């Protein structure tokens, strides 16, 4: 049995723009509803949602039949959390709150087996097709994609050092936390924050490192894509449900 191909990673390396949807709802039913919607990727968030390994597993199973790539954000840059997500078959990880080169190297080590990393070895995980993928430990890294999230002024100051760590496939800019770091909480559209984001995208483009972002502002999303973001999340499932239901109720309010 062969290792599944990571189409997200292949497209990222080919320089293709990929549009995504952020998913905070923990249910597999919701995941399957959005899977065939037409997005290139969906992110299952476990940092700012009730989700964990046991809720992400059925989400992976729910989207598997569809032409969409799952990405998972662990709650932190924790090698144990990362190991558990890799073991259930996650192939693309977005690691949050990476502040410096050392933390970037720690994330890389977490996705690699010894002697090059610290990922624990098990031959009977879902990722190995329960022992049916020959030489999984030697070939797994080929299809694992590591994205690091930059979300503070401090991290922006070390962007080049973080992005050029060997083993990092892409860098994601987090507008919400970045706004707070700049002293503008709740204002990701503040001119100072926007300028910092656009500058970061430009710096990553110079490095040849794929850049990503989440913004439900369609105008700004298009702007980011034009500047060079490779993986751009343009909406959040919770917001779509909340704002859509409010708008429908408002249209019929008496």
Swiss-Prot record:
What reaction does this enzyme carry out catalytically?
D-glyceraldehyde + pyruvate = 2-dehydro-3-deoxy-L-galactonate
| Protein name, per record | Pyruvate aldolase
Q: Where is this site: Increases basicity of active site His?
A: 87
Similarity section:
Belongs to the HpcH/HpaI aldolase family.
**Is the keyword Metal-binding in the record?**
yes
> What top-level class of enzyme does the UniProt entry assign?
lyase
What Gene3D superfamilies does the record tag this protein with? Answer: Phosphoenolpyruvate-binding domains
Source species, please?
A: Rhizobium etli (strain ATCC 51251 / DSM 11541 / JCM 21823 / NBRC 15573 / CFN 42)
């Amino acid at each position: 049995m062969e290792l599944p191909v990571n189409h997200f990673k292949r497209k990222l390396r080919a320089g293709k723009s990929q549009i995504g949807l952020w998913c905070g709802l923990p249910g597999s039913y919701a995941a399957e509803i959005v899977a065939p919607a037409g997005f290139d990727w969906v992110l299952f968030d476990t940092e700012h949602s009730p989700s964990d390994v046991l809720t992400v597993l059925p989400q992976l199973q729910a989207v598997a039949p569809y032409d969409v790539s799952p990405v998972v954000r662990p709650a932190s840059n924790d090698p144990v959390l990362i190991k558990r997500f890799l073991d259930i078959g996650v192939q693309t990880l977005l690691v949050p709150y990476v502040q410096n080169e050392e933390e970037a190297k720690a994330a890389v080590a977490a996705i690699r087996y010894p002697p090059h990393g610290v990922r624990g070895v098990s031959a009977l995980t879902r990722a190995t097709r329960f022992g049916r993928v020959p030489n999984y430990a030697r070939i797994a890294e080929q299809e694992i994609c590591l994205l690091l999230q930059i979300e503070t002024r401090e991290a922006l100051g070390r962007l080049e050092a973080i992005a050029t760590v060997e083993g990092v496939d892409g860098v994601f800019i987090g507008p919400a936390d970045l706004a707070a770091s700049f002293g503008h909480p709740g204002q990701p559209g503040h001119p100072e924050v926007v300028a910092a984001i656009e500058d970061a995208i430009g710096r990553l483009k110079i490095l040849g490192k794929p850049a990503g972002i989440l913004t439900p502002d369609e105008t700004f999303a298009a702007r980011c894509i034009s500047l060079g973001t490779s993986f751009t999340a343009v909406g959040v499932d919770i917001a779509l449900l909340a704002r859509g239901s409010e708008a429908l109720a408002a249209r019929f309010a008496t």
